[in-house]
Protein backbone atom coordinates (compact mmCIF):
# COMPACT_ATOMS: atom_id res chain seq x y z
CA UNK A 1 0.00 0.00 0.00
CA UNK A 2 1.40 3.39 -0.98
CA UNK A 3 1.30 6.39 1.33
CA UNK A 4 -1.21 9.10 0.43
CA UNK A 5 0.42 12.40 -0.59
CA UNK A 6 -1.25 15.36 1.09
CA UNK A 7 -0.87 19.11 1.38
CA UNK A 8 -2.64 21.51 3.70
CA UNK A 9 -2.98 25.12 4.72
CA UNK A 10 -5.19 28.00 5.75
CA UNK A 11 -6.76 29.93 2.90
CA UNK A 12 -8.85 33.06 2.65
CA UNK A 13 -11.90 32.22 0.53
CA UNK A 14 -14.14 34.70 -1.29
CA UNK A 15 -17.72 33.39 -1.02
CA UNK A 16 -20.57 34.96 -3.02
CA UNK A 17 -24.18 35.46 -1.88
CA UNK A 18 -25.18 32.06 -3.31
CA UNK A 19 -22.45 30.31 -1.30
CA UNK A 20 -20.15 29.71 -4.28
CA UNK A 21 -16.40 29.89 -3.74
CA UNK A 22 -15.02 32.51 -6.13
CA UNK A 23 -11.38 32.10 -5.10
CA UNK A 24 -9.10 31.03 -2.24
CA UNK A 25 -5.73 32.59 -1.48
CA UNK A 26 -3.20 30.44 0.41
CA UNK A 27 -0.28 32.55 1.67
CA UNK A 28 1.55 29.41 2.84
CA UNK A 29 1.14 25.68 2.21
CA UNK A 30 2.69 22.60 3.79
CA UNK A 31 3.31 19.20 2.21
CA UNK A 32 2.64 16.18 4.41
CA UNK A 33 0.09 15.03 6.94
CA UNK A 34 -2.17 17.76 8.28
CA UNK A 35 -2.10 18.47 12.01
CA UNK A 36 -5.01 17.44 14.21
CA UNK A 37 -7.68 20.10 14.60
CA UNK A 38 -6.44 20.95 18.11
CA UNK A 39 -2.86 21.38 16.83
CA UNK A 40 -3.55 23.56 13.79
CA UNK A 41 -1.70 26.85 13.60
CA UNK A 42 -3.77 30.06 13.62
CA UNK A 43 -4.71 31.49 10.25
CA UNK A 44 -3.64 35.08 11.07
CA UNK A 45 -6.09 36.66 8.60
CA UNK A 46 -7.44 38.96 11.33
CA UNK A 47 -9.75 41.73 10.18
CA UNK A 48 -9.45 40.93 6.47
CA UNK A 49 -11.64 37.87 7.13
CA UNK A 50 -15.30 38.86 7.54
CA UNK A 51 -18.62 37.04 7.62
CA UNK A 52 -20.49 40.15 6.45
CA UNK A 53 -20.81 40.58 2.70
CA UNK A 54 -18.97 43.58 1.28
CA UNK A 55 -20.26 45.79 -1.56
CA UNK A 56 -19.35 43.02 -4.03
CA UNK A 57 -21.68 40.67 -2.14
CA UNK A 58 -18.62 38.67 -1.07
CA UNK A 59 -17.68 37.29 2.34
CA UNK A 60 -13.98 36.59 3.06
CA UNK A 61 -13.82 33.41 5.12
CA UNK A 62 -10.83 31.46 6.50
CA UNK A 63 -10.81 27.84 5.29
CA UNK A 64 -8.52 25.05 6.43
CA UNK A 65 -7.97 22.76 3.46
CA UNK A 66 -6.40 19.31 3.32
CA UNK A 67 -5.81 18.00 -0.20
CA UNK A 68 -5.22 14.35 -1.06
CA UNK A 69 -3.02 15.04 -4.06
CA UNK A 70 -3.45 11.68 -5.81
CA UNK A 71 -7.25 11.74 -5.66
CA UNK A 72 -9.63 13.82 -7.82
CA UNK A 73 -10.29 17.39 -6.69
CA UNK A 74 -13.06 17.62 -4.08
CA UNK A 75 -14.11 21.28 -4.28
CA UNK A 76 -12.97 24.79 -5.24
CA UNK A 77 -10.78 25.18 -2.13
CA UNK A 78 -8.96 21.96 -3.03
CA UNK A 79 -8.56 23.14 -6.64
CA UNK A 80 -7.06 26.45 -5.53
CA UNK A 81 -4.71 24.66 -3.13
CA UNK A 82 -3.36 22.51 -5.98
CA UNK A 83 -2.96 25.53 -8.27
CA UNK A 84 -1.02 27.30 -5.50
CA UNK A 85 1.22 24.24 -5.03
CA UNK A 86 2.22 24.40 -8.69
CA UNK A 87 2.83 28.15 -8.75
CA UNK A 88 4.69 28.06 -5.40
CA UNK A 89 6.94 25.34 -6.89
CA UNK A 90 5.93 22.89 -4.16
CA UNK A 91 4.76 20.46 -6.85
CA UNK A 92 6.09 19.87 -10.33
CA UNK A 93 3.83 19.84 -13.39
CA UNK A 94 2.05 16.53 -14.04
CA UNK A 95 2.56 15.30 -10.45
CA UNK A 96 -0.87 16.29 -9.08
CA UNK A 97 -4.24 14.79 -9.90
CA UNK A 98 -6.16 17.68 -11.50
CA UNK A 99 -9.13 15.56 -12.59
CA UNK A 100 -12.31 17.59 -12.46
CA UNK A 101 -10.68 20.97 -11.92
CA UNK A 102 -12.82 22.80 -14.49
CA UNK A 103 -16.04 21.46 -12.97
CA UNK A 104 -15.00 22.56 -9.46
CA UNK A 105 -14.09 26.16 -10.38
CA UNK A 106 -16.66 28.88 -11.05
CA UNK A 107 -16.45 31.45 -13.81
CA UNK A 108 -15.50 34.67 -12.04
CA UNK A 109 -15.35 38.34 -13.02
CA UNK A 110 -11.76 39.29 -12.04
CA UNK A 111 -11.49 43.04 -11.35
CA UNK A 112 -9.31 45.67 -9.75
CA UNK A 113 -11.60 45.24 -6.69
CA UNK A 114 -11.16 41.48 -6.55
CA UNK A 115 -13.45 38.66 -7.68
CA UNK A 116 -17.16 39.17 -8.39
CA UNK A 117 -19.86 36.62 -9.15
CA UNK A 118 -20.86 36.70 -12.82
CA UNK A 119 -24.64 36.59 -12.35
CA UNK A 120 -25.10 39.89 -10.48
CA UNK A 121 -21.98 41.74 -11.61
CA UNK A 122 -23.69 44.86 -13.00
CA UNK A 123 -25.61 45.55 -9.78
CA UNK A 124 -22.62 44.76 -7.57
CA UNK A 125 -20.44 47.05 -9.68
CA UNK A 126 -22.85 49.90 -8.93
CA UNK A 127 -22.74 49.02 -5.22
CA UNK A 128 -18.92 49.11 -5.19
CA UNK A 129 -18.83 52.43 -7.04
CA UNK A 130 -21.33 53.96 -4.60
CA UNK A 131 -19.54 52.56 -1.54
CA UNK A 132 -16.18 53.84 -2.75
CA UNK A 133 -17.64 57.28 -3.42
CA UNK A 134 -19.31 57.38 0.04
CA UNK A 135 -16.12 56.33 1.82
CA UNK A 136 -14.32 59.41 0.52
CA UNK A 137 -11.50 57.20 -0.73
CA UNK A 138 -11.84 58.51 -4.28
CA UNK A 139 -9.74 61.51 -5.25
CA UNK A 140 -10.73 61.40 -8.91
CA UNK A 141 -14.13 62.62 -10.12
CA UNK A 142 -15.00 59.11 -11.32
CA UNK A 143 -14.40 55.66 -9.88
CA UNK A 144 -14.83 52.54 -11.92
CA UNK A 145 -14.56 48.80 -11.55
CA UNK A 146 -12.20 47.54 -14.24
CA UNK A 147 -12.80 44.02 -15.51
CA UNK A 148 -9.50 42.24 -16.08
CA UNK A 149 -10.99 38.95 -17.28
CA UNK A 150 -13.91 36.55 -16.95
CA UNK A 151 -12.47 33.10 -16.41
CA UNK A 152 -12.09 30.20 -14.00
CA UNK A 153 -8.38 30.91 -13.45
CA UNK A 154 -7.04 34.18 -12.00
CA UNK A 155 -3.74 35.87 -12.68
CA UNK A 156 -0.95 34.06 -10.85
CA UNK A 157 0.76 37.18 -9.48
CA UNK A 158 -2.37 38.19 -7.54
CA UNK A 159 -1.80 35.03 -5.46
CA UNK A 160 1.81 33.87 -5.87
CA UNK A 161 4.93 35.86 -6.81
CA UNK A 162 7.74 33.35 -7.46
CA UNK A 163 11.33 34.45 -6.97
CA UNK A 164 13.83 34.66 -9.80
CA UNK A 165 11.36 35.21 -12.66
CA UNK A 166 10.49 38.10 -14.95
CA UNK A 167 6.92 38.57 -16.17
CA UNK A 168 6.34 41.18 -18.88
CA UNK A 169 2.53 41.03 -18.71
CA UNK A 170 0.92 39.57 -15.58
CA UNK A 171 -2.39 39.07 -17.42
CA UNK A 172 -0.77 36.30 -19.43
CA UNK A 173 0.25 34.06 -16.52
CA UNK A 174 -2.53 32.18 -14.73
CA UNK A 175 -2.50 30.63 -11.26
CA UNK A 176 -1.24 27.07 -11.63
CA UNK A 177 1.64 28.03 -13.90
CA UNK A 178 4.93 26.55 -12.67
CA UNK A 179 7.68 29.04 -13.53
CA UNK A 180 11.18 27.80 -12.79
CA UNK A 181 13.74 30.25 -11.48
CA UNK A 182 15.29 32.14 -14.39
CA UNK A 183 12.09 32.06 -16.47
CA UNK A 184 11.19 35.17 -18.47
CA UNK A 185 7.63 35.51 -19.73
CA UNK A 186 7.58 38.13 -22.47
CA UNK A 187 4.49 40.29 -23.11
CA UNK A 188 3.55 38.18 -26.15
CA UNK A 189 3.74 34.89 -24.19
CA UNK A 190 1.00 33.06 -22.32
CA UNK A 191 1.49 30.60 -19.46
CA UNK A 192 -1.17 28.38 -17.91
CA UNK A 193 -1.48 24.92 -16.33
Map each language-model feature to its residues.
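Terminal amphipathic alpha-helical/low-complexity segments used for targeting or macromolecular assembly
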Residues: 1-161
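Generic hydrophobic/packing signal
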Residues: 4-8, 171, 183
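Generic structural hydrophobic/aromatic packing signal, biased to beta-strands
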Residues: 24, 83, 167, 171-173
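Residues in flexible loops and secondary-structure boundaries
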Residues: 30-34, 175, 179-181
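Glycine- and small-residue beta-turn/loop positions that connect adjacent beta-strands
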Residues: 162, 166-168, 174, 180, ...
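Conserved small/polar residues in nucleotide/adenosyl-binding loops
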Residues: 191-192
Amino acid sequence: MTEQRTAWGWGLASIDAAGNTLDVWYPELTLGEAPAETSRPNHNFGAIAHDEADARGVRRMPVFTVSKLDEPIEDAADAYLRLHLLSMRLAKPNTLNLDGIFAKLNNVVWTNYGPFAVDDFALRKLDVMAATRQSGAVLAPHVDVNVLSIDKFPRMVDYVVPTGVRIGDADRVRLGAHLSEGTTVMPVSYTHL
